[in-house]
Amino acid sequence: DRSVSRGLGDVYKRQIMDYSIRDAKEAGFNKVVFIIRKDIFEEFEEIIGSRIKDQIDVEYVFQELDDLPEGFEVPEGRTKPWGTGQAVLCCKDVVKEPFVIINADDYYGKEAFVKLHDFLVSGEDLGREFTMGMAGFILKNTLSDNGTVTRGVSVVDENGLLSQVHETTGIMMGEDGKIKCDLPDVQEWISPEDKVSMNMWAAYPEFLEFLAEDFKTFLSEVEEGDLKKEYLLPNIVDKLLKEGRANVKVLETQDRWFGVTLSLIHI
């Protein structure tokens, strides 16, 4: 992933971003914030941003390994990015409105954008410190013909609220028509009809304020010598659920996913 032409210049990925931004704009969103590395900015802007800015307002923020809170340093030998939680945190100073988080190389379909937009503008209060939304895809609609996938396998209560999310690797459809995965506990109950997170979340600016403090907690708990631990959105949301600080409305979408890194679109 050292080369923009290899990592971002490929036509397929550009088309996915074009479709997602078109769908977001049609749903009512009016700005996109691209979260990228600073060293690819010029080529990214030339290949993608220059076309997109004629359709929708565009801003950029940079996710860098050394963009850490005061008092923290990058562990010697670490090269792996800090994860999707830090990526979204990078937007704190430019996003002051309700927003939706997406992966730039996943195509989500129109329905998810419409449902999350309408949820945000409704101002629905779910009764806890943080009100959030999640696009709930049907697991069988998000499988790949090219191997296993990682999904946030979700448990949804009778009120349509997220009660648990399990970041699960190695998901595939077995020859017997049953879902297989790497987590033994999840394997006991996982089914093709389960709702899964595709990292498409709806939130309000106060969530970014929370990330700013919680990222410090995460960094303080990284064990010495661990050069790969990541600050990931599904784990962050699961933590808020377990602490009783958030309610997350699951908005089901029947659209089929396809994908080929993190972007944020807001109202």
Predicted regions: what they are:
Residues 110-201, 205:
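Conserved core of the sugar-phosphate nucleotidyltransferase
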Residues 1-12, 266:
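Single conserved hydrophobic/aromatic residue that forms the stacking wall/gate
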Residues 61, 101-103, 133-138, 252:
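Short beta-strand segments
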Residues 195, 249-255:
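Catalytic beta-strand/loop signature of glycosyltransferases that borders the donor
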Residues 36, 202-203, 261:
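A conserved hydrophobic position in a structured secondary element of the catalytic/binding core
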Residues 14-103, 108-115, 122, 127:
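Conserved N-terminal catalytic core of the sugar/cofactor nucleotidyltransferase
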Residues 65-70, 140-142, 171-173, 257-258:
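A short acidic, often aromatic-flanked loop/helix-cap motif at beta-alpha or helix-coil junctions
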Residues 212-216, 222-245:
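A C-terminal functional module that forms or caps the active site or interfaces directly
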